[in-house]
């Protein structure tokens, strides 16, 4: 199988199952025009996140890594009327684009975009948060995902979902000798989860327009 096939199948899935969406298209276009990297989740992946949040009946969602707000919009649309989503983004320009996209989507009342280092933002949020998050989506620097996961665990409850994107690294995750910080972060996370009796977890390998990677899904016991 080749990237061309993966991309073509993604296009087929979008054509068959994902109706045209002016708001999401505008979000991608605004991010591109602002020079943001085109590393947001694909439309089928965004729909998958949306469906998981619906199945979860999530009322509180935490997202670590906003980029231009594309996945944020997918997730926030799954929230009930009284739902809230907190998303964290280290890059000020990315956060500004995300806020604009979220406002265009009519979701500003439900979504808070926090701009800053997630290490600091999470530490503050842990002190402030009284109610657990029903779902957390981690799509930020992979070297730090063990820290992000532990913080998310402290703000979760039994039945909460924690999802971590880009955990296969085009297969590099199996290289125990890798010196790549992202690969090392993912491997450390996997080892942590494997030892952690608080969660049940798996990894789904993914292919598509975004290439070959994977999504970790952890259910808090």
Where are these regions (language model features)?
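Beta-strand-loop-alpha "switch" segments that mediate conformational coupling across diverse proteins
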Residues: 27
């Amino acid at each position: 199988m080749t990237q061309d096939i993966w991309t073509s199948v993604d296009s087929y899935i979008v054509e068959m199952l994902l109706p045209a969406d002016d708001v999401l298209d505008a979000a991608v276009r605004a991010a591109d025009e602002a020079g943001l990297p085109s590393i947001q989740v694909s439309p089928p992946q965004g729909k998958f996140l949306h469906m998981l949040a619906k199945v979860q009946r999530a009322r509180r969602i935490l997202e670590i890594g906003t980029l231009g707000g594309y996945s944020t919009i997918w997730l926030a649309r799954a929230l009930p009327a009284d739902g809230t989503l907190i998303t964290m983004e280290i890059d000020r320009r990315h956060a500004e684009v995300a806020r604009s996209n979220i406002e265009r989507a009519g979701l500003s009342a439900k979504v808070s975009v926090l701009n800053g280092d997630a290490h600091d933002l999470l530490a503050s949020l842990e002190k402030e948060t009284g109610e657990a998050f029903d779902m957390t989506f981690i799509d930020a620097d992979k070297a730090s995902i063990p820290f992000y996961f532990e913080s998310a665990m402290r703000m979760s409850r039994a039945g909460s979902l924690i999802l971590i994107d880009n955990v296969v690294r085009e297969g590099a995750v199996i290289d125990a000798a890798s010196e790549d910080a992202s690969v090392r972060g993912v491997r450390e996370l996997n080892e942590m989860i494997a030892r952690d009796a608080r969660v049940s977890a798996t990894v789904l390998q993914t292919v598509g327009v975004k290439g070959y990677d994977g999504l970790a899904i952890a259910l808090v016991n």
